[in-house]
Amino acid sequence: MISFEGIPAIYFNSLFGKSNDEAKYIITGNNRDVNRYKWNYKNISKKLSNKNSKQSIFFEKISNLLSIRRKQKAFHPNASRHNINLGSKIFSFKRTSINKKQTVICITNLSSKIQRAKLNKIYHNWTNLIGSKIEIKNKLLILKPFETIWLSTK
């Protein structure tokens, strides 16, 4: 969702990998309470200072994605987006900068199994902005389970 057009909206609790607060929902019966967990400042500060905690890892990863997004002209809030059909288990679209100088192809494997996608263009010379080198075998892009890549022209 961070790669969609517009300004990313992220629930505060998502920054820390907080699961739904089902206990609060059961007590109140209010659907919105499921994602309204109230953090104690001291508690979250302690968790963030531990680089191995789930909260610290989530915060670091999401902060990194937002930092990468901020530097890409193709992720300008008004840059265009066009869907790309790579199959029912792969969600993909293309973002193009307003000045047409940068294109980013966002591809996500929605399944728990390896997926292969045939790309019409040669993307192996492009840069994956958010991960390691992309894997291409027999002209097919290989995506690990739940993997997301952002392929950029620059």
PLM regions and their residue ranges:
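Loop/helix patches that line or flank the sugar-binding groove of alpha-linked glycan CAZymes
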Residues: M1-V104, S112-Q115
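Surface-exposed beta-strand/loop patches in extracellular or lumenal glycoproteins
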Residues: L110-H124
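C-terminal beta-strand-rich structural cap/linker in extracellular carbohydrate-active enzymes
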Residues: K137-K154
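Short acidic, Pro/Gly- and aromatic-enriched capping/linker segments at domain boundaries
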Residues: S3-G6, G131-K137
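Short aromatic-acidic-glycine turn motif
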Residues: H124-S132
